[in-house]
Amino acid sequence: MMKKTKKGRVSWASDSMLCQVKLFLSDDCPVKVASNLPPGFEATDYATKRIISHIPRIKWKRPPLFVLDDALLVGSGGKSIETRSENLRISKVLEAFYPHRSVIPSRPSLTLAVEEEHYDDGKTPNIPLTHVEDERDAAAESSHSFEAPAAVSGLGPELSLLASAALSALTKEQGSQVDPDLLVKLLSDPKIVENLINGMKGKPLETANNSLNTDITEPRLAPQHVTSTTMDRNPPPMPGNVAPHNVPVSVQSSATDPPLPKPNQPMSSALSMNLTLQKPTPVVHNYPLSSGIKVEDSYTAAPLKPSTGDDVVVSEQKTQLLFPCSSWNMNKVPESARTETDPQIRNGNTNRDDQVSAKPVKDLDYFKNLIREHGAVKPATTETNNYKGRVDHKKIVKVRIQKPCMYFNRPKGCRMGESCLYLHDSSKRLWTDVAPPHFPRAKRLKFGS
């Protein structure tokens, strides 16, 4: 027999048994839990309830939208409205085409509103383009300059240029005792200038120079008497139809000779300097134009005989250059026929020691450049005088070993690349264990498919 089972039923409590129960969690704060505590919790006292009720309320303020920091760099005009309107205006402007020049307005860049306005352009200040320093220099030069318009009125164009150049050269020299006013007065009178020119033509060059001496004192060099008279006593044989060329050469230095004028001074001022001109016996050398001249080490002095002839050689210091004049009767050698030693003879540099000292000295950089160009030498050691141990890597020579690189032209290649110390020669095949390249084979035909 089967037992009878009772079904569980839920019945509603009676009115006397009904009560309200509030459920809460232990983590909830006392504010969420109401004052009506459930049964069994009436004895608990919350001390923090009074403290919470007395906390003052803070009024909420809305923070600003942007807080700019002084350290930040903000681009100006990034959100400008005018930029958009300007671009829109430019895009709406149409390009104008004028069929003829007469149709083009006078000033199309100006608007009508600007053309209608009346403005005096004379009120606009002129901005100078020159610097302030240039204006001061120009004012200083104009205050110290001498105005002499009458100085060149009665003279020719060449004489006026020479006179102005001589005046400017004499006034610029420091410690010059030449009176510029007196010089201007003399040059302004054409009669005095003509008399001076005629007097210079009638007298020898020596007396003319002695009459125009200036009181300019300069330090003199020590006397060095060097006169080249013997040059190539046994000249080389001349070819068939080559005529000999005669060149009188004479270089003399004495303590009584004054220094030559500066190169930037004209010839008129050079004539006013104290130049003592003498006529040594010219030595004529016969040599063909196509052959060189051999200078001997021994020099013998030739006697000097002053005369008033046309052939005059200026005696000057050995270390200075000779300035040729049109009155000197010296045979000129054409440019195509000048030899290597011709400039040395004309300049008076006949000493072989001077030629040796003029050669550049080969320093350490010269040999390093040779090593860098030709290679195959060990790199130079680091110099100890480098500042704070720094080494110039450009001067270090990379040595390449004369042995082929075993990784070059392999499938993976050489990792070092151009900086590899071994040779990278693509013409040679450095390995034999590489399989021949695979060529595509023809497809097999399938039968019976």
UniProtKB/Swiss-Prot annotation:
Molecular functions per Gene Ontology: DNA binding; zinc ion binding
Zinc finger (C3H1-type): 400-427
Positions of region (Disordered): 335-357
Stretches of the chain forming a coiled coil according to its record: none
SS bond partners: none
Keyword terms, alphabetized: DNA-binding, Metal-binding, Zinc, Zinc-finger
Annotated signal peptide: none
PROSITE patterns xref list: ZF_C3H1
Keyword Zinc-finger tagged: yes
PANTHER family: ZINC FINGER CCCH DOMAIN-CONTAINING PROTEIN 45-RELATED, ZINC FINGER CCCH DOMAIN-CONTAINING PROTEIN 6-RELATED
Name the UniProt record assigns to this protein: Zinc finger CCCH domain-containing protein 68
Organism this protein belongs to: Arabidopsis thaliana (Mouse-ear cress)
